[in-house]
Amino acid sequence: MSHPNVLLLGAPGAGKGTQSRRLVDEFGVEHVTTGDALRANKTKDITHLDVEYDTPGAYMDAGELVPDAVVNEIVKTALDDADGYVLDGYPRNESQTEYLDSITDLDVVLYLDVDEDELVGRLTGRRVCEDCGATFHVSFNQPETEGVCDACGGSLYQREDDTEETARERITVYEENTAPVVEYFREQGVLAEVDGERTPDEVWTDVAAAVDERTA
């Protein structure tokens, strides 16, 4: 049985992590994120790409943006190794979008649409497990024990970039960069827009239906 290839788009706080985990559980796909792929390949030799540093980790350690050529190759390797995937955190610009379209066949592109003020509220109240990455919220989805992850018992913390000012900056940058990506896939006829301002279960109903429809 083949598994679907899903691209998940949405601003920070849109609920991509929650929906990605459910896609993994329901459809048996692999969750591929740019960050995880880069961290797993920190020491990969990239001298053949004719870039400044010899490994992806060198860019990360220097706090510099990893070039598209490097990110593209790392993502391609991760997708090639996956029997179905949900891709999150890539592509981030038009160049990466065109590259992705050239190396894989997407069954559906899901865009979680959430208003900016709602996103800010979600981000500033978000708490993340330092061990397993599970997310909770001070206003909704609270853990059973304050400060403790329900899933693994790890400690919960607030990310440094989850302040209101930083959250709005992140959202603005994301929307500026991703608007052309969304439009690209809309024109390709593979985009499914989902109202992300509802409960996770309600959002999931539409997410699962969109994947089922495109892979039937």
From Swiss-Prot:
Pathway connected to this protein: Purine metabolism; AMP biosynthesis via salvage pathway; AMP from ADP: step 1/1
One GO MF term attached to the UniProt entry: zinc ion binding
Entry GO CC: cytoplasm
Keywords: ATP-binding, Cytoplasm, Kinase, Metal-binding, Nucleotide biosynthesis, Nucleotide-binding, Transferase, Zinc
Region (NMP): 33-66
GO biological process, one term: AMP salvage
Annotated residues for binding of AMP: T34, R39, E64, L65, V66, G89, Y90, P91, R92, Q96, R159, R170
UniProt-annotated binding residues for ATP: G13, A14, G15, K16, G17, T18, R126, T135, F136, R198
Localization annotation: Cytoplasm
Function description: Catalyzes the reversible transfer of the terminal phosphate group between ATP and AMP. Plays an important role in cellular energy homeostasis and in adenine nucleotide metabolism.
NCBIfam families hit by this protein: adk (TIGR01351), PRK14530.1 (NF011103)
Domains (record comment): Consists of three domains, a large central CORE domain and two small peripheral domains, NMPbind and LID, which undergo movements during catalysis. The LID domain closes over the site of phosphoryl transfer upon ATP binding. Assembling and dissambling the active center during each catalytic cycle provides an effective means to prevent ATP hydrolysis. Some bacteria have evolved a zinc-coordinating structure that stabilizes the LID domain.
Name of the protein: Adenylate kinase
